[in-house]
Every structure is written in structure tokens, then in C-alpha cells.
Amino acid sequence: MQDNKPIGITFVSENFSNSIDSFWIIIKPEILINPFDFISVENVQNTKTIGMIKELKRIYIDSETFSKNHYSTQINLLLNSDERLSGGLTVAKIDVIANLQLISFKEDISSNTSSPNKIPSKSKNWNINMPVQEGKLVTFATVEDVISSLGIPEMEHPIPAGVISMTNNIKIPIDLDVTYIFGPDTTHVNATGISGNMKTSYLLFLLQVLHQKLSEEGISIILLNTKEKDLLYIDKEREETYASEDKEELDILGLNLTPFNNVKYFLPRGLDGKPNSAHIPEKNYFTYSFELSDVYDRLELLFSSESTLDPQHNISSILNYIYELWPNLDQRGGDKGNPQKIANWTDLINFSEFPEEIVTHKTTLLKFQGMIQKYRKPSTLFVDKKVTSRYLGREIKKMNKNEVFVIDIARLPTLDEQAFVVGDVMKTINEMYSLGHANNPDDEYDSVGSGDEIDDQKEITKKELTKKPKYIVIFIDEINRFLPRGESGNMGLRMSMSNRSAVAEELLKILITGKSRHCILFSAQQFKSQIDQSINENTGLHVITKLGLSELSTNPYSMVDDTTKSVISKLHRGEFILVHPAFRHPIKIAIPKPTFKKP
């Protein structure tokens, strides 16, 4: 049971004033307390203020002046008989999280009617914005206090998001409503912090929880593995013994997490058709590769924006020509008047019969052929004919609810190839939604045919749609590779937006449309200053681990106050700061260690 002994007292002075947003307290000398601890103060008119420790400092207050205040009696009650106010005091600045009404189960109608200004005893949602008065005793907040102040009881579909651990050893489960993650309130999750501070572990923990909690409605997860073996064991039990502290945190959160199930691993095709991967799972793995017929309509994903927008070499006109006339590229035809067909990458490299209005300079064609050849020579990913490997786009379109796809790109030899895979996945998902795979089944059938045929077709479509997920999550670590920061300055910003790569544009579509689609992005990187500002602008939940103050001083962290930045620079491994509009202030949480195997 929690000990609610006083730990401090509220006060005001010439230099320390209280407002509706913050107030100051004197800390009892022997009490240990830390930033992000929650405290409780009973205020006027049967109300309670819940606050968070934001700043701690030592100050000097003249004891003679202090004793003149009318709350000196409470000071004496707070201190032990052998303690006296010395020249120095520890004081804390408290940010107000919420003002709560103390619920009374006794109706006192007469007192309510006789005192017009008294808050009704049964009012639960009273808009209270009164500064905390001086001379009020302060205690650590209870679990119920914290949960109520953060608005968790009002959440219709709570998703466990971590545990607050206070200095007095009280642990508090923290939830996020599913609407904070998938919309319509907010969407997307981004984690940032220096390497080795478990930012990826937090995102995977949240994904495990979502996979478990949303299985009835249907959720599918696509994980892009960018770091060697990092995500290639997620369906395996961890080998280390699970610590009692981690078990306790799982119990507090009401979770019984197991490794991911329904996992399929997609590994890039390597030499002789074998997987090009740092680890080959025991089962449920497939290789993937790309025929020209798979991606003829998205070749721009292979090229940088500089290449496609270069006025001297109009590569984009060639790409558009291929897309519009595929596979009959030569409209003029051969001797027999039949168009020349392009079947594979080799044919495309050797094809030179583009119309003059498409290829105005021979150097443009040579540059195009050279760039395609660049991907063909060292790579085993772009094949003329697949034998055992699969096309990712086709597999994603067949993805059923509660399946987990791990797409390994870690050992692809170039960033361009990695980006192409990411872009192809994003474009496939964007096409799925634009074609209405999750729409009303009445829109999913061909209207041509008899009434019975249409009814049969609708019934088949409805059965297929029941297998489709309501929610889709895409996880990308090191997203700064694929959606990097643009130039600074107003003109530079406009230029960088127009010069985004085709891959970046597909990612941007996911970010912008996530709310309406229930299709969201979980992303991570070391530094927010390295990523496109659109990620920060469209992300609802920001997860921050340890960072240096120089990084924290950059513009992407403007939503964090200076005191919180100071705490972030001192975080230990496994500690996370959550920033979300649902919380009036950032909160510090921890999570249990992963239940699946880590390489």
C-alpha cells in the first residue's frame, strides 16, 4: 500500500509565484525525489491538483521572513523535531497536469445551495483553473491520481504503452488510445536517440502489444530490416531468463506477450538464387527479386530526383514512354508492322528505338541504359526471369490480417537498391488503398454481368475482405536514409520539397494519408535533425531516448521544454520520454525487455 506521508509544502515568495500552469514546493529534507515524479496537493473547494516535478534547485530563504508567513505551522508539522529550516532549502517547480474534483459519496444539498460558489460534490468534469494555494501539504501521487490526470479512464480502446516508475517505487501503467496511434486523433510513431538506447526495442514492444490487442479487428505488420540480423528472430523465444522486474512490468500492464506469430521472412535473392542475408530463418522464409514486368510502372524509384528532373537528360520522358506503351515499345513496328516487345531487363538495356521526341539527345539514352546496367551488373535482385523467388508487391497485396512480414534489405549492396525496395513496398500499399482494397465490398466487383453473377461476385469479395486487415503498420529503422532532411531556409525548403526522390514521395503519401487509412508508419533514427520535417509534422507520438544537448537545441525538438531536454541528456538505457498531445507534458516511462530472441 502506498505511503501518503507529506513530502513537501507549497509556498510563494517574491521570486517564486504560483500560476494555473505551475507552482513551487519546499521538499522535506530527507526526501528523495526526481524530475518526472508525480505529486498531489489538496487545493481549495474539495479539489486536488496533480503535478509533475520539472525542476529541482537549492535556494536561500531568510528564516525570519519565512516565519512571518501564515503557513509556518505547517512547516513545523512537515519537519521532524530535530530539523530546522537552515539557510538552504530544496525546492521544486511543479507543472500542473490536471485538476481533479474529490468525489464525495454523501449528498449535501443544503451546503451546495447555501454556497453558490461551491463546486457540486458529484461533479466529475469540472473545468478548474485555480492556482495552488501556499501552505498546502504535498504527497506523492497515487496510481489512481496519475491515471486520472492523464485521462486514461476516458480512453475507449486503451493500448498499453509503458510503465511510469516513481522514486517511491510506485509503478503506474500508461495507456494510449488506439485513436492516438491510428487516427483520427493522431497517427504515426517516431523514435529518436543515440545508438544503443533501445529505441527500436520500444517500437517493437508497442508493435507486439498492437498485434495482440487488435487481432480481432485485424492488423498486419511490415517490418523493413535495415541492420544485419536485427529483426530476423522475432518469432523465436528469448534465450536469456526473463528478469523478475520485467515480469512485474508485464503484470502491471496486464500483458502476456509472446514472440510474434504468423511471421514470413522475405530475403533478397543472392548468387545462385540463395538468400543474401546475414541470417536465414529455419522456416517461413522466401527470397524476393524483381522482373521488369513487376516494376515497369515504377522505374522512377530507381532514379534520384536530380536524374529525372535534369533538363539536359530528360530521363522522365523515357520512363513515361515505357509506362504508357508497355510492353509494345516500338510503335513504328518492324518489317512486318508488328511492334517490338520488351520482355525483360536485358531487352530494355538493348532497346534503342525510342522516338526522337522522347530521346532528343543520344547522350540521354546512353545515360538511361548505363543507369539500368548499373543495377544489373553487381546485383542479383533484378532478374530477367524469377524461378523460386517472389515479387514483394504481389505478396503484400495477398497479405491477410494478423500476418507479419519481415523484409530484409540489410545486405543489399547499395543504398539505391535498399531505397528501391522501400519505395516499391510503399507504392504497392498506396495503390492498394487507391484501388479500395479496404473499401465497401459493394465497390469491389465488376458491374458487368447478370444479377446472380454480381451477387456471387459480391459474396466472394466480402469473404476476401474479411481476411484483410483493418490496420497496417510499416516499420522502418534509419528512415533518414530514405527521407532525409532538405535544405534549410524558405527558398531551400521549397526547393527540397520539389526535389524529393520518388521513394521519399511514396513515404510522404503514407505519412499524409495515414489518418484516413489506418495505415501508419513506425520510424526510427538517431537524430531528428537528419530527417525530413514532414515526419515530425505528421507524427503524433514521439519517443525520445538519450540525446546530447547540441542535438536537442535544433528546431525539431521545439515541442520539448528546456528542463525536459536537460533530463533527456541524462537518461539511462531503457528510459524513454513520450511526447504526445494527449499528455499535457512529456512523461518518462520504461518497458519490459523483449520476449523474443535478439541476435
What residue spans do the PLM features occupy?
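Basic- and hydrophobic-enriched, low-structure N-terminal and domain-boundary segments
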Residues: 1-194, 202, 206, 213-218, ...
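Glycine-rich phosphate-binding loop of nucleotide-binding enzymes
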Residues: 161-264, 504, 533
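Pre-Walker A (Motif I) flank of P-loop NTPase domains
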Residues: 184-189, 401-407
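Loop/turn-to-beta-strand initiation segments
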Residues: 218-222, 262, 401-404, 468-473, ...
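Short secondary-structure boundary/capping segments
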Residues: 235-249, 489-494, 538-541, 560, ...
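Helical/strand "switch-coupling" subdomains that flank nucleotide/phosphate-binding cores, especially
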Residues: 254-386
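Conserved P-loop NTPase motor cores
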Residues: 413-563
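Conserved P-loop NTPase motor module
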Residues: 573-599
